[in-house]
Amino acid sequence: MKIGVVTFPGSNCDMDMIHAMGHELQFDVVKLWHKSRDLDGADVVILPGGFSYGDYLRSGAIARFSPIMESIVAHAQNGGRVFGVCNGFQILCEAGLLPGALLHNESRKFICSNVQIKPVSRTACLTREIDDSKPITIPIAHGEGNYFIDNDGLKELQDQDQILFRYCDENGKVNPWSNPNGSLDSIAGVANKQMNVFGMMPHPERAASSDLGNTDGAQILTGLAALIEV
């Protein structure tokens, strides 16, 4: 099993992801450069958080045109797994690999805090093994995490079990007060119809080490590689 982590100009969570996947979870991890088209045999490609290309125009709008994205799109279209976290999620939406868009937070402020999320999809590899009877705690750090999609798109996400996580309170209840950024339907992450491309705003790589006092994110990252035969 080989995990590829992409570095764009402005990425600042790539090394965190490499540490979580390689040191903490013991996967074989390779670094992928935005100017390359070579995925170096990666079974799973991860687009980490940060501020790719300075978030000019809007988050992810320039990164989607990077040479590496041509290979990532082809990888996804061939059934390969792709995972975007925070800015990576924004890039995947801009590239059309995931439905919807990420808008400015409802508060118009950058938010950095721990939040509670609950798994929703019972189909996606990321979430199906996570206990849905209680929330998990994962950090967020974003200014444009307000997920939006039109009404038809939202219904399709719900009907096709494509919603990965919703923001919730510490008791697992979804309500307006537990939604940190105004995301429609309290959505914190989604998958594509084929269930091989995933995106979420919270940072599981920042909650994958007992040294940091939180390993809730490790089960998400482990699920990413589940059932892949190599």
Task: Identify the function of each model-found stretch.
Residues 1, 132-135, 192-197:
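Beta-strand-turn-beta hairpins that frame and shape the catalytic cleft
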Residues 1-85, 93-99, 103-111, 118, ...:
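N-terminal beta1-alpha1 cap of cysteine-dependent amidohydrolase-like domains
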Residues 3-4, 137-141, 198-201:
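Active-site-proximal beta-strand elements of phosphoester/diester hydrolases
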Residues 50-51, 88, 143, 204:
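Active-site metal-binding loops of divalent metal-dependent hydrolases
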Residues 78-79, 159-161, 193:
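Structured helix-beta-strand junction loops
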Residues 97-184:
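Pocket-forming structural segment of enzyme catalytic cores
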Residues 187-211, 220:
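A glycine-centered loop/beta-turn motif at secondary-structure junctions
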